[in-house]
Amino acid sequence: MPADADVTEHHSLAEAGKKVPHGVVCLLSALRYHGLGTQNPFEVWIAIAEKARMPKLEHLAARFLRFSGVALTYGIEEHDIEGVTVRVYGPAKTVADCFKYRNKIGLDVALEALRDCWRQRKATMDELWEAAKICRVANVMRPYLESLT
């Protein structure tokens, strides 16, 4: 990054994208990027392949989660942040991941993300349902999705 470049609010995501190019920004960091919920994580949440080598990062607080198969590859969007291409899960996939990891981040966070995603029209019901099936949380999310309509 050039010395005179402006640092954005997503600087840590750009730094993570540069140091872990095969990783995908997920969960709380993806929620913050998409403007969903009130969570403001102090570390960057990154999804990596199940058998990938764990990156060693200095000067960057990061939490790694291991995803495999279609759960890793589905719903990836590429965004340009500070000149770096950063891979971030889309809103529907991020919400489904929040339900998948509800014991780690809290059910209240997942519900808030779902509510905000629906109210801000970041994803359709079909996109949310497809992501729920891929993340294998369709039965968990069904009552909450039904309550939205």
Language model: regions and residue ranges:
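Nucleic-acid-binding surface
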Residues: 1-149
